[in-house]
Amino acid sequence: MKKISRKEYVSMYGPTTGDKVRLGDTDLIAEVEHDYTIYGEELKFGGGKTLREGMSQSNNPSKEELDLIITNALIVDYTGIYKADIGIKDGKIAGIGKGGNKDMQDGVKNNLSVGPATEALAGEGLIVTAGGIDTHIHFISPQQIPTAFASGVTTMIGGGTGPADGTNATTITPGRRNLKWMLRAAEEYSMNLGFLAKGNTSNDASLADQIEAGAIGFKIHEDWGTTPSAINHALDVADKYDVQVAIHTDTLNEAGCVEDTMAAIAGRTMHTFHTEGAGGGHAPDIIKVAGEHNILPASTNPTIPFTVNTEAEHMDMLMVCHHLDKSIKEDVQFADSRIRPQTIAAEDTLHDMGIFSITSSDSQAMGRVGEVITRTWQTADKNKKEFGRLKEEKGDNDNFRIKRYLSKYTINPAIAHGISEYVGSVEVGKVADLVLWSPAFFGVKPNMIIKGGFIALSQMGDANASIPTPQPVYYREMFAHHGKAKYDANITFVSQAAYDKGIKEELGLERQVLPVKNCRNITKKDMQFNDTTAHIEVNPETYHVFVDGKEVTSKPANKVSLAQLFSIF
């Protein structure tokens, strides 16, 4: 058999087993763990290539015949970092491995059969990840949705009704009528969406009514009063309906301290938002809950990574987001109690230790909706530069750290909110919400986004040019955004109770409507690559953070990767 050099092979088919790829301008190095394509039998589309009838394309159409095949992709997922063909059929991932013509080629499985009905997308030299999931959305403006989508986020979970003061401060869509409006508004967008109801009440009937109206869970927020009673009742109803509860705890410790909140939670599962505390929560020690077995702890992106500008930036943001007044002494003291450089410094380290499990945005309410993915990778890179390789790494690569940080915005938020059966990873049977990246722009600017198996967004040149590539090249909506295609390509998540009662038909929804499930039978141990539990304490006078008796902190960065170099114009 004729052989070619590794350099020639990579240029034709992309990296193979043992090859290493740098992610953007970071120090993070991904190494290909396995190549499922077969040497000499690789798929390649184009003039004089192999994707043609009688070669890699079968002339015997079958029911397994793919709608789309992505060839020779480098998949970066919590399940592994590996090379494979990805087959898509009926909007889902039908197969991962060796695609082609099983009548002519070895190793081709039925679920990766290429036929006359199959479209081809060249994945050689590209990285494929699952679409990101942002679970901390203030639905203040609908313009957030395309902004997040262009960053690689394909699922948004949160609450709100637009720029009302309640929404500016809290991720809550309160009540049946508001949920109806938001569920109907969701029809317009290329984004999977789910809405959180108001959990700040001790009235079980009111809580239940919101879940039956289509909410996928509750948000309890201090601006509405995060009392032990509200926590207990929301969790009681959540347990009954199998939905998640997210919480922003009591910064002022009005109704109790962190110990009182944990007593009210009573060992039940809860998703804690901005668990470090700068975004809100028991001052100064909400961060200690991150080590508990029943807590699914999240960060929001304004505090990660910790930089020389973080502290100064937060004061003005906080005053606006929580309707505070700089002329009122108590409001200023409230803000000061939340912005603690010591706990922010510890946050980066806790992410690197796998104690913090999820990253999210806190969109337009101190966080940036288009930067969840970028800031997650900036944090990973900052921590590698400061602390070196993780002890869990095997070989001369950063694969473990890469899986740890990828999981924070893909599979872990999916598990937390009961949607991991559908989205959150590159696995057979899941919805084909996929993001394609050039390695040089990984984490900053996707090359293309596939939504429900159909191309929804892509970098595209002048529409009047003779080929697709002439400038100006920028993101443009593709056909999955338009007409009734957007209904097939996107999902509205609801509770099982609302699904069973026919919420789709009741509200006249045309999008896919799917129920969340398995929200209450999970713990920290279900958080992939981020399941570390520990005893965390905060010194009440200095705010220094200790994990199992050892102080943890990090230095503020004066320069980060994936930044201005990629945004010159």
UniProtKB/Swiss-Prot annotation:
Free-text comment on the cofactor: Binds 2 nickel ions per subunit.
Coiled coil: none
Cofactor(s) needed: Ni cation
Residues where Ni(2+) 2 binds: 219, 248, 274
Predominant cellular place of this UniProt entry's protein: cytoplasm
Localisation: Cytoplasm
Entry GO terms, CC: cytoplasm
Pathway: Nitrogen metabolism; urea degradation; CO(2) and NH(3) from urea (urease route): step 1/1
InterPro entries for this protein: Amidohydro-rel, Metal-dep_hydrolase_composite, Metal_Hydrolase, Urease_alpha_N_dom, Urease_alpha_subunit, Urease_AS, Urease_asu, Urease_asu_c
GO molecular function (one): urease activity
Reaction catalysed by this enzyme: urea + 2 H2O + H(+) = hydrogencarbonate + 2 NH4(+)
Binding positions for Ni(2+) 1 per the UniProt entry: 136, 138, 219, 362
EC number: 3.5.1.5
UniProtKB keywords: Cytoplasm, Hydrolase, Metal-binding, Nickel
Broad class of enzyme this protein falls into: hydrolase
Catalytic center residues: 322 (proton donor)
Urease domain sequence ranges: 131-569
Family (UniProt): Belongs to the metallo-dependent hydrolases superfamily. Urease alpha subunit family.
UniProt subunit comment: Heterohexamer of 3 UreA (alpha) and 3 UreB (beta) subunits.
Protein name, as recorded: Urease subunit beta
UniProt organism field: Helicobacter pylori (strain G27)
Gene: ureB
